[in-house]
Amino acid sequence: MIQMSKKVSVSLMALVLLAMTATAGTNLAKSAKTSGVKWNPVMDAIIQVESEGNPRAVSGNSVGAMQITPILVKDCNEILKKQKSKKRYTMDDRYSVAKSKEMFLLIQSYYNRENSIEKAIRSWNGGVKYSVRATNRYYKKVMALMK
């Protein structure tokens, strides 16, 4: 009887861990929704500016609909590691619009805790330490597409 209850306990723990792992990606989307910011229009506008919606777009080291660089993938994986998540992104994930949006949301949740749309747009173009002057044109393009 004790062995049976141990097996049941181990099985239940495994199921709970599986459920937690499976929802890791959706937690980002949920937290983005609960923050009060509707990120989809921002991401969709960025996609139009970056690649005109082409998930196969390539420009130097940047690829995919959101033109993600290897450095950004590495940064996302470092954030996930700090969060003790087992999830990791690959270079091929940059070609997936859904995974690219997940990476965008992860970056925003880490570097843009105030959920500033302006900061999100400018930092996507100019990096975390962006220059307002250098990102003005990009910011205006994205904002124009959101209206």
Question: Residue locations for each model-derived region?
Answer:
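Catalytic glycan-binding domains that act on GlcNAc-containing polysaccharides
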Residues: 25-147
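Bacterial N-terminal signal peptides that target proteins for export
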Residues: 2-12
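Sec/Tat signal peptide C-region and signal peptidase I cleavage site
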Residues: 20-24
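Bacterial N-terminal signal peptides
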Residues: 11-19
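N-terminal amphipathic/basic-hydrophobic helices that include classical n-h-c signal peptides
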Residues: 1-2, 121
